[in-house]
């Protein structure tokens, strides 16, 4: 009977589009999963007249969902067991120490430091320990309305356990889903990168500067997605006996990395090329090809999520062929970088087209792993310069002061001050300031909207439905817009307390006050305790970026001299570290915009450095992207490439003046003009761009040090 019903539903015209919409949005899928678990736990209890039990289970499930990690099912089982133990310890400690406020405050502060440092050991532990801190605060909030002291240590971890079992059941039905979601996020992030980059073809100088800044910011998202893919792949590889089941996903990951290197490549300043009518015509075609490639990547991402096999777009193949044909008709200078650009796009197209070709297979690549033991990772955080230790101490002191204010002033539900501190306080000043406004705005909107709707829906059933709708919308918006998600978590809490004690509406004004106090404490703690002003970090970040760029360029030259046989792990690590260092510089520049005025004096200079370093990395990426097809012709170029590497390494140490760079640029120009063959001339053009960008970065870095001293 049930099978026939399912078959009838599948035959409906709306079923397939609905299925695709459902599976192609990971945030929506997560929201439905969490809301279903909360509904299963809360609805029977609330409707049967036991709202405290239902709401406590729901809060436990909420904490469990927020602390869930992307693991192989076996890893998820270990994570769930650890989570339930930590949640029980946290809630049990709160109930035992609740009659002794001084001990509870001290215990809260010390346990917060411990949990955050354990979370720094790895991604799996980070989620569990965050959830343990969160559920402990939930236990503090619910202590006054609990029928007995033993209920919360049972119900809150129990809710997390039941949610975890429900999530595990769904994961066993689709065991590869976390990996597919992370890969899909990576392809979508890269598709957006290509869409932005297409605006450079063609462009003027102002557009070039504006778009390069946006590309640097989008690159942060792409590299973060690649890192998450690597972590999840590592989790799956640790849980499997062999690599064979993982091979399709490893191939997708390697393709994503290769496409990213090609997309990040720059062959010349495109505003200069856009001035030539013939080149402009080809650049317009390159821009259209990039847009077609971004569409293909979105198709790839949707296929990973929905299970629909990837079909290479015919329009992309046609566009690439037309562009190649137009280039053949165009008379270009021997040193024009446009053939490299067109070849780069063609190889990206070929890589995507061969994705499903079973004949195109390589060995299973190794993945970068942290060689340190768990204890060594923990111990490495125990120094005063470690950002995570500083954040843990800030947060624990923030908790301690917030809890003291709550106790000394006998505030109703003053524990919300502590809860606000947890969500607002971030490791950086700029991150905290951003969260502060988002939290306050979201809470105010949630209170106004929530109180209005609770008055319209006075019944238990109506408020239960409103609570579940709030849970769904909270998870659906959590990764998209934090302010919007805060609105719905506020209405969720309002409904929850209204169901338990009919106090949700009366507690909303105190909740606003607690939010303001908690946000203020978070702001003061990050402002006064080890404020990590970005302008002061810029010289160190620039030094690290140049160091990693030099290592990446050195790895490229090693590939030209002696290609890797099968697995190029060392090359991939060098490339990834260069992008991470570039991202750190980009985020520092972005963070400066939220810092106090006197700390923003070097913001324009910081933007120029960020822009130039990202351009330098793009030129290096271009030299690396062509290492396979141009290796044979690189013999006469390698000596100059070695000198360019020496310039990069000297710039890293700060010991190179402008003259040596100028001499190298002059020599590259002379060699390029004296070379007849097109490939070496194109390579020399790339080397010239690398050396020129290095010299510009070095010149600006001297001005940056001067600005820093004045500040």
What are these regions (language model features)?
Residues 1-35, 39, 43, 47, ...:
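Long, hydrophobic alpha-helical segments that serve as membrane-spanning/inserting helices
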Residues 5, 17-30, 47-49, 70-81, ...:
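Short, amphipathic, aromatic/basic-enriched membrane-interface segments that mark the entry/exit
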Residues 15-32, 36-150:
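Helix-loop-helix transmembrane hairpins and adjacent membrane-interface loops
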Residues 28-36, 77-85, 105-110, 149-157, ...:
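Hydrophobic alpha-helical transmembrane segments
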Residues 39-47, 88-96, 113-117, 136-140, ...:
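Alpha-helical transmembrane segments of multipass membrane proteins
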Residues 127, 131-152, 494-511, 529:
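Transmembrane helix-loop junctions at the membrane interface of multipass transporters and ion channels
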Residues 452-593, 597-601, 610:
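Generic detector of multi-pass transmembrane helix bundles and their immediately adjacent loops
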